Design a protein with these regions (language model features):
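Surface-exposed repetitive/solenoidal architectures
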Residues: 1-198
């Protein structure tokens, strides 16, 4: 708490068994650098580079690239953070995130008071409920954020049992996953979204 971390070089995590930073309540200055090769496949909820970004914390000017696809529990997932209650400024995430509930390209859940400004995602996100490119569930504020990634296309494209060329024979009970609250920027929001694009 109250500490400032300054990233002075790009970081490559491809050969590292990385454990998410449990909680962060200081200032993280990315200085435009990239953390690549983030891979999280172990069991557990609330996953990302950071598990929890706390109230009063700031993460800025950082790019994160990687893959998150945990075993077992798969809720609150995002490449940058599983949960954000602080400020995320001018950050970019690129890669693949797969899970169940509150799945976002950048952040799984943006808590009340949490803020994302000038952030962007590219890649693919797959989830069941509250799924989107920037934030899975938004209770805070999203400003000037953008998504250019694909959302929930994996199951539709890769399921050999699904024949979308014959809609008359489509059995939605069998072939279409029961996804809810899926969007481009935010899957579900009871917060504020302004000047965002998808």
């Amino acid at each position: 708490q109250g500490k400032t971390v300054i990233l002075e070089n790009d970081l490559d995590l491809h050969s590292i068994d990385f454990t998410p930073i449990p909680t962060f309540s200081g200032t993280f200055q990315g200085n435009g650098h990239t953390i690549s090769g983030l891979t999280l496949t172990g069991s557990g909820n609330v996953r990302g580079l950071f598990r929890y970004i706390q109230t009063g914390a700031t993460v800025q000017d950082l790019t994160v690239m990687g893959t998150i696809h945990p075993n077992g529990h798969q809720d609150d997932l995002g490449l940058l953070a599983g949960s954000n209650a602080g400020r995320i400024l001018n950050c970019i995430a690129s890669g693949t995130v797969m899970g169940d509930n509150r799945i976002g390209g950048l952040v799984g859940i943006n808590e009340t008071g949490g803020e994302l400004v000038g952030c962007a995602f590219s890649g693919s996100v797959t989830g069941k409920h509250s799924t989107a490119g920037v934030v899975g569930e938004n209770r805070g504020t999203l400003t000037r954020c953008s998504n250019s990634g694909s959302i929930n296309t994996h199951d539709l494209e890769d399921d050999p049992k699904t024949d979308y060329t014959n809609l008359a024979q489509l059995n939605s009970m069998e072939n279409v996953p029961a996804y809810t609250d899926v969007g481009g920027v935010a899957g579900y929001s009871k917060g504020t979204i302004q000047s965002c694009s998808n």
